[in-house]
């Protein structure tokens, strides 16, 4: 992580300043969250259940508010009464419901209500505390159904007089009710597993508000349950500030309901974010000096979870602004960026999977993708909670809806729809204005954000989609197939997760080692590549100076043409082609993955403008490539001609390069797609392959390779002419002493070639050789020295 942060904070990678610092804020925040998570994996502690040495009197409280389902509260009360440890049960009924009075009377439950309804849930519990006498007080949410042995692993921990409360796992029974329920549950798995277990070591175990057992004297010491929207965390803070200790028992002793609709989930998250921010602003400073140093960090960091709403917003804005303004937040080699990001990302995933040995149940293991996506879709709720805190706006304490019904949630989707629409508009505008690789990458990020928004919207409409699928057999069949696919994937996923947990440490060590290796030996690789290039240039010089056998005599015979024993100009001599053309080989953007800053359309248009000022009227562009759109659009706008070239690698298997997916097929598809561009003046087959083959082959093998190339080239030129008979087709040859003979051979074998492009990269070949070429020719590439000594003043068109 230090290597990652050091790399991205380097001054050399800074791009457009506002976007860069926005991105750095997002990166730093994410790294801090990861560090916080890792710190809660260091001391995973499962406390042993002490032997029971005495009996405690226990009061169990649950609540009811008007509108909550009767079936739910009756089920909970019945289960509470079935708990085997002796206790008294209290229903804190805010509605003073007559039906529930009868139920309580029948079950032997104390029915408690109040007339002064203050402090929401905390006030309701405190009212019941005032009329109860138990030494221990259990708070259960009305949707959480306890098991008969609920109290057995908890009670004995209170033999330690310093323990103020004991918290157990919040587990759920409706995880599979829908994507919202599944995602909301997944967000809790790591927290109630290894993270809360580590809080045992730090002395920072939180009271969660449900399934928590308090010592009455501890509550009395702080005046009862603390009030607020996050009353559970407030109570924890007050008790810890008083010096009370807490214990987390990682045991599933009750199961409740997780929000299953978007409105219920958003209400819960808004209540928590507003409540936690309020505690951070108004309570945390007052209690700060009374916390241990671990508790100071703990309660100071928890609100940062809800600050992630701003980070998500930044992540939405960066690609949008980048696409609209045509700027980049960072100037970094994509390979280098991958080398610094991927190892850290892999370590985060592997560590998270490794600690899943300590989650509660097997179904809680996994990537928790649904939970992560749902969290991203909650960005605006977190921001709203923060804004409400600053504005002092109060929101009513409303119990999380439990019925799973939702009529119309489109208004709740408006912020996500805005992000979706804005991102789509930015993608269309940005790529239309400047189709370069970096804009495509940014469009990819914006597209990912669109997917995040679409997921949350689709998840919120899942009930409506189910109704729709039942009305249409096709959708019903697709839904059935998807369910079967998920079942099969679940089996595969279990095996993958198990393997990752087992081998996580070894994989992580391997990744770190590979990162060090690539970083250490990259300079050696560059040196080896440089030496290889020098050897290649040496071989080229040998071929040009006739010190190496180019294989031409054998090739003449293989092609069925007579061998010229002496070189002479036959016919009228060189015929100038593209006369009046002053061109440039424009190769910017070819190695775009290792080029930064990004090659933008603005830079391209400025280059073309300067070219026109110096008299250049044509560029030679190699394609097809990512910059075709920009280059062809800009050259058309500025009335610049294009000599469209195709680079032919010499290592191509020309004997087998036929059919779909072949190089020739790609070239022909490009010609068909672009032949309507009027400012493309010709098609060029680039790279003097027939001569370069002599560097790596010799003898009969060389002859076979060269003959295969000629046959391939003949088929290709024929195909191009069939698609576009009006434009000339040219082919490159290296300018050497043998060039006139080679051109004669190629022109005889492939008469459809309209002209030959001379690649002139040295000054040793006499200029007279250029004049002796008995075919139409032009200069497709020339170095500066060769231009001054051999080409300047010649008749044919020139590309430098």
Regions found by a protein language model. Name each.
Residues 704-800:
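Extracellular glycoside hydrolase catalytic/binding regions
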Residues 141-145, 239:
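The conserved acidic donor/metal-binding loop of glycosyltransferases
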Residues 76-87:
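Short, acidic, metal-binding catalytic loop of nucleotide-sugar glycosyltransferases
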Residues 2-28, 40-43, 50-53, 305-395, ...:
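Membrane-embedded multi-pass helical conduit in multi-pass membrane proteins
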Residues 210, 551-638, 660, 668-669:
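Active-site-adjacent substrate/metal-binding segments within catalytic domains
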Residues 603-662, 707-730:
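Aromatic-lined substrate-binding rim segments of carbohydrate-active enzymes
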């Amino acid at each position: 992580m230090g290597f990652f942060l050091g790399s991205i904070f380097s001054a050399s990678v800074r791009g457009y300043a506002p976007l860069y610092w926005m991105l750095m804020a997002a990166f730093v925040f994410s790294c801090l969250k990861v560090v916080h998570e890792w710190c809660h994996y260091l001391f995973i502690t499962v406390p042993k259940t002490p032997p029971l040495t005495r009996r405690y009197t226990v009061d169990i409280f649950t609540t009811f508010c008007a509108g909550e389902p009767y079936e739910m509260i009756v089920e909970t009360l019945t289960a509470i009464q079935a708990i085997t440890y002796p206790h008294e049960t209290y229903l804190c009924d805010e509605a003073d419901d007559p039906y529930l009075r009868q139920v309580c009377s029948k079950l032997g439950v104390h029915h408690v209500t109040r007339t002064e309804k203050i402090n929401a849930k905390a006030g309701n519990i405190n009212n019941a505390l005032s009329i109860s006498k138990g030494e221990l007080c259990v708070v259960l949410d009305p949707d959480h159904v306890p098991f008969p042995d609920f109290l057995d692993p908890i009670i004995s921990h209170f033999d330690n007089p310093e323990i103020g409360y004991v918290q157990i796992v919040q587990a759920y029974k409706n995880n599979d009710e829908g994507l919202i329920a599944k995602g909301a549950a997944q967000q809790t798995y790591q927290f109630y597993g290894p993270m809360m277990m580590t809080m045992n070591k730090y002395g920072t175990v939180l009271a969660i508000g449900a399934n928590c057992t308090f010592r009455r004297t501890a509550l009395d010491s702080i005046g009862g349950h603390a009030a607020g929207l996050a009353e559970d965390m407030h109570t924890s803070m007050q008790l810890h500030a008083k010096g009370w200790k807490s214990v987390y028992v990682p045991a599933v002793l009750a199961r409740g309901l997780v929000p299953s609709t978007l409105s219920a989930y958003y209400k819960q998250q808004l209540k928590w974010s507003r409540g936690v921010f309020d505690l951070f602003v108004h309570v945390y400073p007052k209690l700060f000096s009374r916390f241990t140093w671990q508790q100071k960090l703990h309660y100071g960091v928890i609100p940062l979870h809800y600050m992630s709403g701003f980070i998500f917003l930044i992540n939405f804005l960066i690609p949008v602004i980048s696409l609209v303004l045509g700027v980049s937040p960072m100037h970094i080699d994509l390979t280098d960026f991958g080398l610094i990001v991927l190892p850290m990302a892999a370590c985060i995933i592997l560590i998270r999977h490794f600690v899943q040995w300590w989650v509660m149940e097997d179904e809680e293991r996994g990537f928790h993708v649904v939970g992560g996506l749902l969290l991203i879709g909650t960005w605006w709720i977190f921001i709203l909670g923060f804004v409400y805190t600053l504005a002092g706006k109060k929101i009513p304490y409303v119990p999380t809806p439990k019925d799973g019904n939702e009529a119309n949630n489109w208004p709740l989707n408006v912020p996500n729809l805005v992000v979706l629409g804005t991102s789509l508009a930015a993608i269309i505008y940005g790529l239309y204005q400047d189709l370069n690789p970096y804009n495509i990458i940014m469009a990819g990020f914006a597209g990912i954000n669109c997917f995040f928004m679409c997921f949350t919207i689709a998840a919120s409409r899942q009930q409506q989609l189910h109704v729709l699928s039942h009305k249409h057999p096709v959708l019903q069949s697709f839904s059935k197939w998807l369910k079967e696919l998920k079942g099969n994937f679940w089996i595969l996923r279990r095996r993958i997760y198990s393997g990752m947990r087992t081998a996580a440490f070894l994989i992580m060590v391997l990744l770190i080692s590979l990162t060090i290796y690539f970083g250490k030996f990259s300079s050696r690789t560059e040196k080896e590549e440089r030496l290889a290039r020098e050897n290649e240039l040496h071989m080229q010089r040998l071929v040009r100076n006739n010190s190496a056998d180019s294989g031409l005599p054998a090739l003449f015979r293989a092609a069925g043409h007579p061998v010229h024993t002496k070189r002479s100009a036959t016919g009228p001599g060189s015929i100038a082609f593209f006369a009046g053309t002053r061109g440039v080989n424009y190769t910017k953007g070819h190695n775009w993955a290792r080029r930064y800053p990004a090659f933008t359309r603005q830079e391209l248009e400025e280059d073309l403008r300067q070219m026109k000022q110096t008299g250049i009227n044509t560029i030679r562009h190699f394609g097809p490539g990512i910059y075709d759109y920009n280059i062809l659009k800009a050259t058309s706008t500025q009335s610049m001609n294009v000599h469209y070239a195709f680079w032919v690698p010499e290592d191509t298997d020309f004997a087998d390069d036929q059919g779909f997916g072949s190089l020739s097929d790609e070239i022909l598809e490009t010609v068909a797609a672009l032949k309507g561009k009027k400012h493309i003046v010709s098609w060029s087959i680039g790279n003097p392959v027939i001569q370069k083959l002599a560097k790596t082959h010799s003898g009969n093998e060389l002859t076979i390779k060269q003959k295969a190339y000629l046959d391939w080239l003949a088929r290709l030129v024929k195909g191009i002419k069939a698609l576009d008979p009006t434009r000339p087709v040219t082919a490159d040859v290296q300018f050497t002493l043998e060039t006139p003979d080679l051109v004669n051979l190629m022109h005889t074998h492939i008469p459809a070639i309209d002209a030959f492009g001379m690649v002139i990269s040295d000054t040793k070949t006499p200029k007279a050789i250029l004049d002796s070429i008995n075919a139409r020719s032009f200069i497709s590439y020339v170095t500066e020295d060769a231009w001054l000594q051999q080409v300047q003043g010649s008749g044919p068109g020139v590309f430098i």
